Amino acid sequence: MYGRNFPFFNSLGGFYPRGNGFPLDAPSLDPRKPSGTGYTSKVRVRDKYRIVGFISSGTYGRVYKAIGKNGEKREFAIKKFKPDKEGEIIQYTGLSQSAIREMSLCSELDHPNVVQLEEIILEDKCIFMVFEYTEHDLLQIIHHHTQPQRHAIPAPMVRSILFQLLNGLLYLHTNWVLHRDLKPANILVTSSGAIRVGDLGLARLFYKPLNSLFSGDKVVVTIWYRAPELLMGSRHYTPAVDLWAVGCIFAELLSLRPIFKGEEAKMDSKKTVPFQRNQMMKIIEIMGLPTKEIWPGITSMPEFSQLQSLAMSRAPHFNRSSNLENWYQSCLKNGGYSANSSAGTPGADGFDLLSRLLEYDPTKRITAREALEHPYFKNGGPISANCFEGFEGKYPHRRVTQDDNDIRSGSLPGTKRSGLPDDSLMGRASKRIKE
């Protein structure tokens, strides 16, 4: 069924490559097990890596492309964390919860469809995570196909991407890890077509939590990929939130645009999480209005009264039943998907899987394990471990620039003055730092 050298299924831990030395049972997140990725002390980034340029930045800090020194010629992505701040003033109060979670989880995780952490390097007032370098991500690939004179992402490529993504997700869920921020930008793709689930900054363990997951992080998952139970204010949630996001990604790979592209309502000054009215409207327009018949638990959701109000005010514009199949058929037609086209087609099996991923009721939503056994993957020939196999086009390399404050200031790791761009300001706490 699967192509040669493709991962095989193991009931304990998911799918693993054949003959690569993985044990038959899943690597577990056992605190008694010595971490495969240790914390490196008394080593500076510039001693081991040559910085090529700047990739991106975010709330966490900055990411750089690097090449190994001392005979190690592989490429790496180095994530440099910002210090925590009190207001606008650098206080060096420690690392964020997100950074600590990402470091602790990535140090233990080991799977071919999850991004590989090489090492963690601690420097004075600065910390770096060194990852394998991936040349692409799904957002970049989707954007490439939206350009004029370009066509739909071939159906076999979509199938391989989705299989590998679910494969990595099964491994995470089997080891009690929720990702909680799956979206195209966080799904990395190597130059050889291997999928890596990346950016575990919002990930967390969900085995017997002391408090509800909501109490720790009130807002999770980027709005367009946020599951309806989260939008409805659920105080506790399950791995099903990740599967909804996979459904959104599947739809986006086919249509080349987000299926539920709503506008996010921001939290107020009291950090109260608002009802995401616009996003819920976008979902209802395609999926129909959720009722207690199709989702019995919805009536007990904190935002149920808000949903009722929304339904009453927008009643003439809402479908009472799902419009997903019409959306899907229109998507296939507009994308040129058919059995006779070069793009191929995901067919009826593709729609069935999509509808089970985008199930309103999280208790009925398909799991990663069930999805991997779905006819969409069982039928239709072998699945390639290289999602680019058979694709004649070329995707552009990831953009790497010199346009970054660290590079201009000489504080980039690998230059003479390594560390944060503001490390020279220690002792001048009144100085405010521009972002």
From Swiss-Prot:
The keyword Transferase applies. The active site is at 181 (proton acceptor). Residues 398-435 are annotated as: Disordered. GO terms for biological process: negative regulation of filamentous growth; negative regulation of transcription by RNA polymerase II; nuclear-transcribed mRNA catabolic process, non-stop decay; positive regulation of transcription by RNA polymerase II; protein destabilization. SMART domains: S_TKc (SM00220). Component of the srb8-11 complex. The srb8-11 complex is a regulatory module of the Mediator complex which is itself involved in regulation of basal and activated RNA polymerase II-dependent transcription. The srb8-11 complex may be involved in the transcriptional repression of a subset of genes regulated by Mediator. It may inhibit the association of the Mediator complex with RNA polymerase II to form the holoenzyme complex. The srb8-11 complex phosphorylates the C-terminal domain (CTD) of the largest subunit of RNA polymerase II. Belongs to the protein kinase superfamily. CMGC Ser/Thr protein kinase family. CDC2/CDKX subfamily. Component of the srb8-11 complex, a regulatory module of the Mediator complex. This is Serine/threonine-protein kinase ssn3. It comes from Aspergillus terreus (strain NIH 2624 / FGSC A1156). The gene is ssn3.
